[in-house]
């Protein structure tokens, strides 16, 4: 429960203590002239107060995004195909990182992998009424204080900010795909098999 709801809270959460082995600060050595190890007891902080999506995109490298992906999905073996960093403060507030995963055969298990936060407080992993249907296979995090905490379908569909955020996410994904195509068409074509799969109607259970 703590990991799900408090993983990225902006204040540190201490849960007991942890013990690490460190070199003796006084430089004491053993019989083999090696610096001895001593125990260092410190607070066990269980949350990440500064997750990648709260940082400026210019301060992050590709390996940082991949590392955060592994932090979100430690059981995911494959690296994502690409990522999109959301960072908007007008006319609505929206931050986050969305990843396009390497799709598995069973597309259904890939859903509900986008977590919604409000100021780093977890709200829900059901974003079907916030993120367009054809993008719900994306993974990642979106954080916005402008999305109402009442996440009922009818309430979200009527909210103006939600509509703007949904449209913005769609444009960002389209822009990313366009840039990928223009920048490195060969690489884009290699990833296209995974990308186009998410647009098949059967992915959403519709016939």
Language-model regions: role of each:
Residues 1-207:
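Conserved GHKL (Bergerat-fold) ATPase module
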């Amino acid at each position: 429960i703590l990991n799900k709801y408090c993983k990225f809270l902006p204040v540190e959460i201490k849960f007991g203590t942890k013990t690490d082995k460190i070199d003796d600060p006084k430089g004491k050595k053993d019989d083999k002239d090696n610096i001895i190890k001593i125990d260092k007891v410190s607070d066990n902080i269980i949350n990440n107060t500064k997750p990648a999506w709260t940082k400026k995109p210019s301060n992050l490298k590709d390996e940082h995004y991949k590392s955060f992906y592994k932090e979100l999905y430690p059981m995911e073996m494959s690296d994502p195909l690409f990522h999109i960093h959301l960072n908007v403060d007008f006319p609505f507030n929206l931050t986050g990182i969305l990843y396009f995963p390497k799709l598995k055969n069973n597309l259904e298990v890939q859903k509900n992998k986008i977590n919604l936060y409000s100021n780093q407080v977890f709200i829900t992993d059901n974003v079907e009424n916030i993120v367009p249907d054809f993008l719900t296979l994306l993974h990642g995090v979106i954080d916005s204080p402008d999305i109402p905490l009442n996440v009922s379908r009818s309430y979200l569909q009527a909210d103006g900010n939600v509509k703007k955020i949904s449209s913005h996410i769609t444009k960002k994904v389209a822009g990313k795909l366009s840039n990928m195509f223009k920048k490195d068409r060969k690489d884009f074509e290699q990833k296209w098999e995974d990308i186009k799969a998410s647009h098949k109607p059967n992915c959403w259970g519709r016939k």
